[in-house]
A protein has these predicted regions:
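Long, compositionally biased interface segments
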Residues: 160-184
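Solvent-exposed loop/linker segments at secondary-structure transitions
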Residues: 1-161
């Protein structure tokens, strides 16, 4: 379900009336934000709402709004490594990604499991460049939790969300994606 949701993030952003024309490279949904699953058959609006209604935006509407940030290729590799190394022990940290693929060896040392990581735009494999900025979409809660990576790793790992110009983001509410003046 998380993979479908991350694909839906990309679709929602790139098909919004206020789309800025900058394609989404990666969309991320941590499993801890997915609240329900679906049984085979028809799916109701209520079921969709229940599966993903965590939080509330500044606009008072249930569900965290989407944010747009930029991470370097090196930071995306770090995110893949965190997913491969930590998510078996902390299942709420499992990342479901659209646009980011990686291969890992579960028998390798923690934080050294990923053997290959790259972008996949649906038509081709794109190698990550360590210093290049890539557009990442996630929900507000996930963005706010990124500082936990640095804290929990005692500074060994770092993911610093940035604006398109590389300036670190101080307030994630400044990067909420909107459509017609409403949070997306």
């Amino acid at each position: 379900l998380g993979d479908i949701m991350s694909d839906a993030y990309v679709y929602a952003v790139e098909n919004a009336a206020d789309f800025d024309g900058v394609p989404v490279d990666v969309a991320v949904v941590p499993s801890g934000t997915v609240r329900d699953t679906y049984a085979k058959g028809d799916i109701t609006v209520e079921q969709v709402f229940n599966s993903f209604s965590l939080g509330i935006g500044a606009d008072g509407v249930p569900g965290y709004p989407l944010i747009s940030v930029y991470l370097t290729g090196k930071e995306l590799k770090t995110a893949a490594e965190i997913d491969a190394s930590v998510s078996d022990f902390m299942t709420t940290a499992r990342l479901y990604c659209s646009g980011l693929d990686f291969t890992y060896n579960p028998n390798r040392m923690i934080l050294n499991k990923v053997t290959d990581v790259y972008l996949d735009d649906g038509t081709q494999r794109i190698e990550l460049e360590d210093d290049k900025l890539y557009r990442v979409v996630a929900d507000l809660y996930s963005g706010q939790m990124l500082s936990a990576v640095t804290d929990m790793s005692y500074g060994l790992l770092s993911l610093v969300p940035k604006y398109a110009d590389g300036t670190p983001i101080e307030d994630f509410e400044d990067v909420i994606i909107t459509e017609n003046g409403k949070e997306l």
